[in-house]
Amino acid sequence: MNRKHLPFIFALLLCLTPWVSSPTALVLGFLLASTGLVPSQLPLSTYTKKLLSYSIIGLGFGIQFQQAIAVTSDGIGLIVVTIAGTLLLGFLVAKVIKLETTTAYLISAGTAICGGSAIAAVAPAIKAKDQQIALALATVFVLNSLALFIFPVIGHALALDQQTFGTWAAIAIHDTSSVVGAASAYGEQALTTATTLKLARALWIIPVSLLSAILFARGNSEEGKRKLVLPYFIFWYCAAIAFSDLFPQFESVYQGIFSVAKQALVVCLFLIGCSISVEKLKSAGAKPLIFGLSLWVVISTTSLSWLLLTR
């Protein structure tokens, strides 16, 4: 590693601080890769996959299972329908626009559940490549940024009450950070509702990841004999949720682990960004963004329509 790689080291250390957000880390890695400042001898793919798994496990300590189940009894039906509907719609739209299957599935999972965290969890289960992960994350991050500003404006224009807006934000916005940001801008009650529902929605990472491993093992197998690779870290993720619920006296420790996991996820996104380049993105074209935007518009409008009709 020579002097020209010093920017890589500096950027990596910077991603360990709270000053760098997930989207910024992805862009930072991409810029370094595009300018040839990433050490070519580093096994980025190996490091990324391991760190992603550990990050997801750590995030499990931030989910309060009992509270999420109790508060979301009224909204769980809508959550299930939107998750299943989004995954099914994603399959159909991908066929129509002829988008590569793995990338389309990652974007669908991110839209259906919880953005980058869902993509990170599903990716190892379906053996996604770094470029596919990066395209899915980039698509979700662009839409997240738009949602942060658009949703409160629409909410005020339609005079949505606090609970309705909080529910809508939790259902239709990808990442927890954008859900919290949009809901907090709308009101305190909206923030409480949105945060709790979002955590309940995040629980679906577990069954969706396991189902994904099974589906892709069958669908992509050579002569039907490809070995099924289960994302075992998901079981540890589930164990983390259960442990934090059974032993609430260690709440301060859990919050610390959760914070470290979130920062580790930022580092993951930086490493993923380091594995792509302008040439790779150009080869993908505009299809991923068009695909993600289509899914997002459908889930946003249908969930809002349902909430307006039933409130």
Swiss-Prot record:
Q: Tell me which GO cellular component terms the UniProt record holds.
A: plasma membrane
Where in or outside the cell it occurs: the entry states: Cell membrane
Q: Which Pfam families match?
A: Cons_hypoth698
Keyword Membrane (UniProt): yes
Gene source species: Vibrio vulnificus (strain YJ016)
Q: Which superkingdom heads the taxonomic lineage of this protein's source?
A: Bacteria
Give the residue spans that cross the bilayer. Answer: 10-32, 51-70, 75-97, 104-126, 136-158, 165-187, 202-221, 228-250, 254-276, 288-310
Alphabetically sorted, this entry's keywords are:
Cell membrane, Membrane, Transmembrane, Transmembrane helix
Extract the InterPro entries matched here.
Answer: UPF0324_pro
The name under which this protein is listed is UPF0324 membrane protein VV1122
Question: Member of which family?
Answer: Belongs to the UPF0324 family.
Keyword Nucleotide-binding (UniProt): no
Q: How does it sit in the membrane?
A: Multi-pass membrane protein
